[in-house]
């Protein structure tokens, strides 16, 4: 996962990290751990993030599968 691209999309969508965590139903501290260990993100979590950020398929692929 490209953490910096994901963080950029969070900002582009006018959210803070705590707001994003709430939007995807994740504890803020858990989100921070996911940022530090991006290989531990699940498919379900990636899909929730994609939906919360209104990412197109190609954007999601670039962020989560790179």
PLM regions with names:
Residues 14-33:
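Short alpha-helical DNA-recognition segment
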Residues 10, 21, 50:
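The alpha-helix within a helix-turn-helix
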Residues 9, 23, 34-35, 63:
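Residues in the recognition helix of alpha-helical DNA-binding motifs
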Residues 38-51:
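Short, basic-rich loop-to-helix N-cap that marks the start of a DNA-contacting helix
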Residues 1-15:
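A short, Lys/Arg-rich alpha-helix, primarily the initiator
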Residues 54-66:
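Short C-terminal boundary/hinge segments that cap the last helix of small helical domains
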């Amino acid at each position: 996962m490209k953490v910096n691209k994901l963080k950029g999309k969070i900002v582009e969508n006018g959210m803070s990290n705590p707001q994003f965590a709430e939007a995807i139903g994740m504890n803020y501290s858990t989100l921070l751990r996911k940022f530090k260990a991006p290989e531990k993100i699940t498919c379900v979590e990636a899909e929730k993030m994609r939906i919360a950020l209104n990412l197109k398929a190609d954007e999601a692929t670039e962020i989560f599968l790179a």
